[in-house]
Amino acid sequence: MKMLFTSLLALIFAGNLLAADVAADFSAANRLYAEGKYSDAATAYKNILQTGWQSSAMLFNCANAEFKAGNLGKAIAAYRRAEHLSPRDSEIRANLAFVQNQVQGATIREDRWQGWLGQLTFNEWTLLAAGAFWLTFALLIARQIRPALMPRLRSVTRLTVALTVFSSAVLALQAANHFNSSVAVVTSAEATARSGPFDEAQSAFTARDGAELSVLDRHDNWIQVADGSGKIGWLPVKQVEVLPGA
């Protein structure tokens, strides 16, 4: 028990040291941004993110720095990751939309249905569906134990059943989008999509910095993508940042 307690104290102490280091690095990155050293600031933010310390604020600042440095694709990727963590943050959504409007060429756009689904995170939809299910289950048990309550609980039970069905259906859609779909954001000035996953293949189309493409397939260090106009081609992975479904 004493060894366990000592180990716990060591972990807490190490965690506090890590938090202090992150806070210091974050302040240093903010100073670089304030001084107009946007590329250096973006690198500093990314170094913190690579330690596993993820937050929407950190990603948002990183995205701002990337945009100021002229890196549209990297900015969009960081904004998208920040939006994934805080989907109802109006400032993140506004900045993302602003940068997306700077992108040239065909790019995929989020439709209204996806935008509505994105108002909650995948975990929040999961909690909503689970909460509705257990509330319905509790009401059904209460009706069995106390039959006299049945008339008063009938309407409420119908409502919770409807909520359970609806939230479960939405959760299924979110799960399909979250686990089965990906978006690739072009992070180079120009990326030539080819008809096959090799350099000698014929050019299919050209995507500009910041273009968002649907990921269709993968082969070695190549991904097959489709742009907003429906054109399909293969791009080297090094020219894009692949994001999971929202």
What is each stretch, according to the model?
Residues 34, 186-215, 219-221, 239:
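Beta-loop motif signature
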